[in-house]
From Swiss-Prot:
UniProt keyword Protein biosynthesis present: yes
GO MF terms, alphabetically ordered: methionyl-tRNA formyltransferase activity
Protein name, UniProt field: Methionyl-tRNA formyltransferase
InterPro entries: Formyl_trans_C (IPR005793), Formyl_trans_C_sf (IPR037022), Formyl_transferase-like_C_sf (IPR011034), Met-tRNA-FMT_C (IPR044135)
EC code: 2.1.2.9
Stored CDD domains: Met_tRNA_FMT_C
Species: Rickettsia australis
Keyword Protein biosynthesis included in the entry's annotation: yes
């Protein structure tokens, strides 16, 4: 999970990509909500914002704009 705009968002489905990168862990590195990890990249596929229904990443991003280079915690 991560926090964004004071909301807790659960990652329900994701794929781990074992690839090298130079980003800080937690950085959003694409418009498709790919997140840099300590090593590798997490490609988010399904999420759920607190008190909301679960959505695939495309549906979620239509209603919530998380900009590239945002650092999630």
């Amino acid at each position: 999970y991560f926090s964004y705009n004071d909301k807790v968002i659960k990652i329900l489905e994701a794929e781990y990509l074992n690839t090298n990168h130079h980003f800080t862990a937690g950085t959003v590195i694409s418009d498709k909500l790919e997140i840099a990890c300590g090593s590798g990249i997490l490609q988010v596929q399904k999420l759920q914002q607190e008190s909301k229904k679960a959505l695939n990443v495309e549906e979620f991003l239509r209603g919530t704009n998380i900009l590239k280079a945002t650092i999630l915690k």
